[in-house]
Design a protein with these regions (language model features):
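A conserved amphipathic helix/loop scaffold
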Residues: 8-169
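Aromatic-Pro/Gly-enriched surface loop or interdomain linker
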Residues: 1-3, 120
């Protein structure tokens, strides 16, 4: 099976999706979800009770609001440990952390210091939540670290040019 599953901007959850994710993480999988996920059901009706719908316990948080930035407006996400920061634009989701641990926080605006990325241990696995539409370098570096920790080996050791995808079967 898969060691890591990435679900970016998974706006709509089809029936049964939450249970599949729950079992995957409980059994040791690594799940990565981003902002604007679990907002509606398969009928495009808003999920009641909070988002990400049906996975708040797995993710260890509840979304409270999302700040849509104007064109050209940016914010910063800063690592909780270390001196690393990245720019973000378009979307900055605010979350209320329950059991998740912040890995990155926002650096500016009224939500400075609030989580921009979290990790939650659930069962035998981990669930990561990316709250910000950060620059590509953020995703390259963070995903590389998560995938390595999960024990996924790269098919090629050298850098892969932009626009090229490498997969193994």
């Amino acid at each position: 099976g898969y060691k890591v599953v990435v679900a970016p901007m998974l706006y709509m959850f089809r029936a049964g999706f939450e249970e599949k994710v729950r079992k995957f993480v409980e059994n040791g999988g690594t799940f990565i979800m981003t902002y604007w996920s679990g907002v509606v059901d398969e009928n495009d009706l808003c999920v009641l009770g909070g988002t990400p719908g049906g996975l708040m316990d797995v993710m260890g948080l509840r979304s409270t609001e999302i700040d849509a930035l104007y064109d050209g407006e940016t914010n910063v996400v800063k690592a909780v440990v270390g001196d690393v920061s990245y720019q973000c634009e378009r979307f900055c989701q605010l979350v209320d952390v329950k059991t998740a641990e912040p890995l990155f926080v926002y650096g500016e605006d009224f939500y400075a210091g609030t989580p921009a990325m979290t990790v939650n241990e659930f069962g035998k696995g981990k669930a990561y939540y990316v709250c910000a539409d950060a620059e590509q370098k953020f995703f390259d570096n963070v995903y590389e670290e998560i995938v390595t920790k999960a024990g996924v080996e790269r098919p090629l050791k050298q850098a892969i040019p932009e626009g090229i995808e490498v997969s193994t079967r």
